[in-house]
C-alpha cells in the first residue's frame, strides 16, 4: 500500500533556515527587513564604492543584538556574516559610521528572528 501525504502552505513567506543576504549599495541596504529562523546567520555584502561599518542598534551602544556586530567594517566588495541569531526578537541595524537620525536612513534595517 502506498500512502501519499500532501499539504498546502499558508500565506506569507516562511523564514529561511538557510540564511539571508543583505546587500549594501550607494542607494542603501536591500532588503531593509528580513525574517529568519532561529540559528540563522545573515550575510551582509558591500557592493558600494565606500566602506560601511554595520552594527546593532541602538547607536552608539550597539547592544540590542550583539550577533550583528560581528559584521563590522566592510570594505567595498567584502561580505561578512552575523553570528548565529538564536533569540526570537527583532533586531535593528545601522552603519555606525553614518548613524541614523530618528526614523532611520538608507543604511538601516531590521532582522526578525522567529
Please report, for each region that a protein language model flagged, where it lies by residue:
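N-terminal edge beta-strand
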Residues: 16-41
Amino acid at each position: 500500500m502506498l500512502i501519499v501525504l500532501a499539504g498546502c502552505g499558508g500565506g506569507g513567506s516562511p523564514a529561511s533556515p538557510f540564511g539571508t543576504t543583505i546587500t549594501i549599495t550607494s542607494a542603501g541596504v536591500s532588503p531593509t527587513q528580513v525574517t529568519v529562523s532561529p540559528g540563522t546567520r545573515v550575510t551582509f555584502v558591500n557592493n558600494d564604492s565606500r566602506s560601511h561599518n554595520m552594527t546593532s542598534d541602538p547607536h552608539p551602544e550597539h547592544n540590542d543584538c550583539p550577533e550583528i556586530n560581528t559584521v563590522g567594517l566592510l570594505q567595498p566588495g567584502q561580505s561578512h556574516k552575523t553570528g548565529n541569531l538564536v533569540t526570537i526578537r527583532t533586531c535593528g541595524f545601522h552603519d555606525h559610521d553614518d548613524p541614523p537620525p530618528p526614523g532611520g536612513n538608507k543604511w538601516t534595517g531590521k532582522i526578525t528572528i522567529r
